């Protein structure tokens, strides 16, 4: 069953050039779904379109958009407690003049009616998931942490809300190999054991083949191939997909992607 089903998604710029060209996309419930492709293909644009985060100079249209079996016009009301978003711009998620403990507590209590103690308990649990300890984080400011630490705090801030769907745009790109694999193991555990759904945009093809159940391949704004992991491991593939999987490298990113 698909958690998100969007038909004929098109994204255009002010010159009416189509950046995303009428794609059909399903995100399957309780699975790790992946979107892969070269830089500039439009992967991050799709994630932002799903969340209504597109830049003002881009327009988005679609024929139909369903979330959990219901037609929706806006997903913003689901953001946070139902849909979590892990973006590439984690450094912009926290201010520099408030301690992280206070910021995380405010985020949690914005979405759930809870005491400060209950919020801190959820925060502590989420930080432990990303291999951090509350005593090392909560009394610090964001600028006192390394980039890798801050990204893990950001991931924890999404996970602590226990969203039904997590949309993750390069969630481990700034982490070292060990912490990156640990975070991917954690995300896999959340999907398998707690029934959550993950839609991941990544350049790491090794992670895709190891963790994902369903894969979408994007090229120049069009989805050229879709299928479950067995299709990508054992069946004849589009030449472009074969090339991506053959190299299994992290592809270069650009401004939009």
UniProtKB/Swiss-Prot annotation:
GO terms for cellular component: plasma membrane. InterPro entries: AAA+_ATPase, ABC_Ni/Peptide_Import, ABC_transporter-like_ATP-bd, P-loop_NTPase. Transmembrane segments: none annotated. It comes from the Bacteria. Its EC number is 7.2.2.11. It is found in: Cell membrane. It catalyses: Ni(2+)(out) + ATP + H2O = Ni(2+)(in) + ADP + phosphate + H(+). It holds the Pfam family ABC_tran. PROSITE patterns: ABC_TRANSPORTER_2. Keywords: ATP-binding, Cell membrane, Ion transport, Membrane, Nickel, Nickel transport, Nucleotide-binding, Translocase, Transport. Residues 4-245 form the ABC transporter domain. It is a peripheral membrane protein. GO terms for molecular function: ABC-type nickel transporter activity; ATP binding; ATP hydrolysis activity. Signal peptide: none annotated. ATP binds at residues 37-44. Its main location: membrane. The complex is composed of two ATP-binding proteins (NikD and NikE), two transmembrane proteins (NikB and NikC) and a solute-binding protein (NikA). Part of the ABC transporter complex NikABCDE (Opp2) involved in nickel import. Probably responsible for energy coupling to the transport system. Belongs to the ABC transporter superfamily. PANTHER family: NICKEL ABC TRANSPORTER, ATP-BINDING PROTEIN (PTHR43297:SF13), OLIGOPEPTIDE TRANSPORT ATP-BINDING PROTEIN APPD (PTHR43297). This is Nickel import system ATP-binding protein NikD. It comes from Staphylococcus aureus (strain bovine RF122 / ET3-1). The gene is nikD.
């Amino acid at each position: 069953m698909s958690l998100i089903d969007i038909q004929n998604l098109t994204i255009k710029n002010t010159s009416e050039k189509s950046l995303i060209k009428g794609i059909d996309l399903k995100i399957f419930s309780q699975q790790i779904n992946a979107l892969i492709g070269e830089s500039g293909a439009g992967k991050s644009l799709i994630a932002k379109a799903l969340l209504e985060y597109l830049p003002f100079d881009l327009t988005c249209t679609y024929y139909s958009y369903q979330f959990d079996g219901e037609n929706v016009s806006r997903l913003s009301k689901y953001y946070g407690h139902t849909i979590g978003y892990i973006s590439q711009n984690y450094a912009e998620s926290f201010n520099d003049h408030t301690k992280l403990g206070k910021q995380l507590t405010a985020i949690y209590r914005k979405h759930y009616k809870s005491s400060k103690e209950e919020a801190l308990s959820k925060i502590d649990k989420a930080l432990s998931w990303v291999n951090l300890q509350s005593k090392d984080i909560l009394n610090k400011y964001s600028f006192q942490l390394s980039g890798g630490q801050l990204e893990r705090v950001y991931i924890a801030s999404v996970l602590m809300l226990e969203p039904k769907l997590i949309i993750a745009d390069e969630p481990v790109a700034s982490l070292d190999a060990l912490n990156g694999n640990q975070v991917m193991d954690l995300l896999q555990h959340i999907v398998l054991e707690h029934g959550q759904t993950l839609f991941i945009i990544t350049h790491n093809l090794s992670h895709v083949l190891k963790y994902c159940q369903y894969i979408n391949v994007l090229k120049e704004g069009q989805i050229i191939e879709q299928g479950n992991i067995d299709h990508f491991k054992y069946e004849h593939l589009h030449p472009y997909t074969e090339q991506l999987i053959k190299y299994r490298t992290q592809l270069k990113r650009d401004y939009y992607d």
